Every structure is written in structure tokens, then in C-alpha cells.
Amino acid sequence: MMIKPRFRRRATPKSINTVFQPPGTISYVGEQRTEEVTTETILYNEHEFSQQEGILLDRLEDDQVNWYNIDGVHDINLLERVGDKFNIHPLLLEDIANTTQRPKTEFYPEGIYQCIKMISYDATHHELMDEQVSILLTQHAVLTFQEKTGDVFESIRERIANSRGRIRTSGNDYLFYALMDSIIDHYFVAIEQIGEYLNNLEDEIFDEPDKESLEKVQKNKRLLLTLRRAIYPLRESISRLLKEESPFMDNQIKSYLQDAYDHCIQIIETVESYREINAGLRDMYLSSVSHKMNQIMQVLTIMSSIFIPMTFLAGIYGMNFEHIPELTWEHGYRYFWIMCGIMFISLLGFFKWKKWL
């Protein structure tokens, strides 16, 4: 199944005021949407595999992994029906419907809830798009809730369909980890592309800095801040998964989660490194602009220094005194220009000798 790219600039969420609503009230908070919600059911074990559209709750069985994917959390009625089927806590459903959540992990009697930001980089416009993904691990199933159609899980679908790796022989908890790991892997893709952009921007600022260069530096600052806000809470979430015991997750999965935690640390270190590089680019830009201004001022100063003596001579012989001896010379005008030429050449040679030119 091919997934069409659908990442675009994220609009500012048009939030519903939920401040004075009772806890557990399910209200959609996020970008206004009118598209139809799409759902998908993937069922598999070591020997069988099926993938169909829709939520096939009648086929929920214990001897297989049941993955239910919902693209679109603005349909509150659908969320309530799914919540009734899996006995999902109302507070959890409230978090799923709120797409402005901070990445976090919560443990409920019904299962483990993971909120995570899915990141995509648009190289054409140099923008980061983030989308909230809610992953719920229960005793019998894994549920994923996304804001819209399309995701970074196609590699997992292919592994399941082609029985590659250990995913077909593992349980719901391994799928829970694999989904998180796929999202984290795409952080690396975004970071690598941002790193290449920083290298190109560094060359641009060094060769020919302009106003657009500073705007690009400021844009980089915002992108890296977006990554930082997504990855720091995720590190805390995985750390909590590693520390706390849960009947829904086997201890063997924690070795894989430790690897995901290490990846988060690596991403954080890279992001902080890029933030320092970006700050250095800003300083480089300001230094380059200052150096260019100094060069312009140097040229103007040298030109002024050369013409000041000539202006002095012209001022003397332009005075309105009646008796100025040189004014009566037959070749006085020629001598004036010869004198100006000598001063010009002398000052030019002096500046060259001082290496000011």
C-alpha cells in the first residue's frame, strides 16, 4: 500500500476552550479539519497476515497482533466508539483528541499511552512539519491515532507483510516499540538534511553574506527549537518506560527501548551542536557585514585623505586676496596640477607601503 506524501506547513491550531470543561470531556483541539477519517486494521502472527481498511473489531483475537490505525482524531464519535470497545479511560481519549500535547508516557489500567511528535523535513521550503501521534498499547491490541492520512510507518507495514525481522514472531509490545523507533529514525533524516543546509549556509555567509542569510539563520533557530521541544520530552518518556514495570510490556523489550533512548541522546547532542553552529553562523554574518563595512570606510577614508591636500591648495589659491604671487605666474595653473599629481602619487605610495590598500 503506497502512502502519498501529505506533510505541509502546520497551521496554528484553532483550539477549543477546554479550560472550564469537566475532566475527561473529549473535545478536538487542533487544526480545523473537514476530511473524512480513514482507518486501517492489520492483523498478523507468525503464520498469517491481513491488512484491510476499517476497524475490524470483530476479529480481535489473543493469538495474533492486532494493529488498528486511525488517521484523523477530529471525529469524536469514532473516538468514543473505539474507547468503549477497548475500555479506554476518558482522560486518555481527551489527550488523544488534543493535538497540542507535549510528548509523554502515561500508564493506565487499560494499557500504556505514548504521545510522540512525528517530524518531517521539507527541503524545498526548508521547513519542519510536526504531527502528533498517539500510540496505545493494550493487552490485546496496539492503536495508533494520527492527525491525518499518511505516516512514516510504511517500512513497518512492509516488514510485517514480507515477514522480515522478528516483528511477525513478536507481540504487541514489540510493535509498540517498532512504531516509536520508526518515528525516531525519521528525526535522524531531518537532522541530516538540516546539517547539509547549515554547511551550505556557512559557505554562503562566508562568500557573500546578505540580508537573506540572516533570515535563514533565524529560521534555522526556529527549526532546531522545534526539534528540541519534540526530542527532550521523548527522552523523558522512554526513560520512564525503562524504569517502570508494566504487565503490558515484556522486560525483553526494554533492551530495544534502551537503544531508542540512546538514539534520543544522540539526536539531542546533534541538535545542541547544530544550535551552537547556527549561533556561530549569526556571529559570522555580523562579523562579515562589519568587515565589509570597514572595507568600505577604509576606501572612503583613503579617498578623503588623498583629496584633502588638493582641497587645501585649491582653497588657498581661491582666496580673494589682491596680491597672491603665484596667480601672476604664466604656468601657475600647470604647476598646481603637477603639485596635485605629486601629492596624489606620494600619498598613494604611502598607503601601499603601509598596506592599507
Regions found by a protein language model. Give the residues of each.
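Peripheral, non-transmembrane regulatory/ligand-interaction domains of membrane transport proteins
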Residues: 1-243, 248-250, 256-259, 263-268, ...
